[in-house]
Amino acid sequence: MGAIMLDGKATRDEIFGDLKQRVAALDAAGRTPGLGTILVGDDPGSQAYVRGKHADCAKVGITSIRRDLPADISTATLNETIDELNANPDCTGYIVQLPLPKHLDENAALERVDPAKDADGLHPTNLGRLVLGTPAPLPCTPRGIVHLLRRYDISIAGAHVVVIGRGVTVGRPLGLLLTRRSENATVTLCHTGTRDLPALTRQADIVVAAVGVAHLLTADMVRPGAAVIDVGVSRTDDGLVGDVHPDVWELAGHVSPNPGGVGPLTRAFLLTNVVELAERR
């Protein structure tokens, strides 16, 4: 008997339905939310991702604000664009699309974003607020993972969650979300220095694979009935594949597909952050 699929697309559509109603209420009150994007260069993946975000905005009624810049811009020009969106009253929240060209300092650019307009929830100030448990925009992918688990009634409180990957966008902030009192999970954060990874994953009620190593998590590493969340993406000769080997589906209780699992929720919670910022005004 195969695992139950954690359907991120269906869950995203539920979120969009809720957001559409909330945006309509904000619009009626003269507070229409706006999502801004800063895209530097012509990377096809980044261009497609930004197009997708603005298509999502159209579905729920959020205003789109695009700033597309050539790859050879100066730091001063990028800073001016960030400052312009910081001051733009029509822009409720925005993101600087990564990666930036190598001559630009990504960390400096992200820190220049007004924390009150941080749609990604990854500004150092907002990550600090997450540590302290004070209200702030939450990182989109970790928030999507928690929502997906709850949507399928997978118990988080008291669960042992093994997170593979310590990146700033997923692994580290996910540990912070899962150890809040509202989630109350016990989290083991694994990385390249972890000894005997399979011994840890076999103990887990929930495994989150977020490293970008094709088919890293195999069936012999998973406890029967465990929930498995596949976040990482790798490009292979066969196309894009996740961190979770297909054989895991035969053993696990629940598995998120990749694509179609967490990715749609990352985009959904980007819009959710913008709507929540507008509602707090």
Swiss-Prot record:
Domain of life: Bacteria
Signal peptide: none
Catalyzed reactions: (6R)-5,10-methylene-5,6,7,8-tetrahydrofolate + NADP(+) = (6R)-5,10-methenyltetrahydrofolate + NADPH; (6R)-5,10-methenyltetrahydrofolate + H2O = (6R)-10-formyltetrahydrofolate + H(+)
Enzyme Commission code: 1.5.1.5, 3.5.4.9
Transmembrane segments: none
Residue positions binding NADP(+): G165, R166, G167, T192, V233
Pathway assignment: One-carbon metabolism; tetrahydrofolate interconversion
Xref: Gene3D superfamilies: Leucine Dehydrogenase, chain A, domain 1, NAD(P)-binding Rossmann-like Domain
A single GO cellular-component term on record: cytosol
GO biological process per UniProt: L-histidine biosynthetic process; methionine biosynthetic process; purine nucleotide biosynthetic process; tetrahydrofolate interconversion
Gene Ontology terms for molecular function: methenyltetrahydrofolate cyclohydrolase activity; methylenetetrahydrofolate dehydrogenase (NADP+) activity
Family to which the UniProt record says this protein belongs: Belongs to the tetrahydrofolate dehydrogenase/cyclohydrolase family.
Summary of subunit composition and partner proteins: Homodimer.
Job description of the protein: Catalyzes the oxidation of 5,10-methylenetetrahydrofolate to 5,10-methenyltetrahydrofolate and then the hydrolysis of 5,10-methenyltetrahydrofolate to 10-formyltetrahydrofolate.
Protein name, UniProt field: Bifunctional protein FolD
Species of origin: Mycobacterium tuberculosis (strain ATCC 25618 / H37Rv)
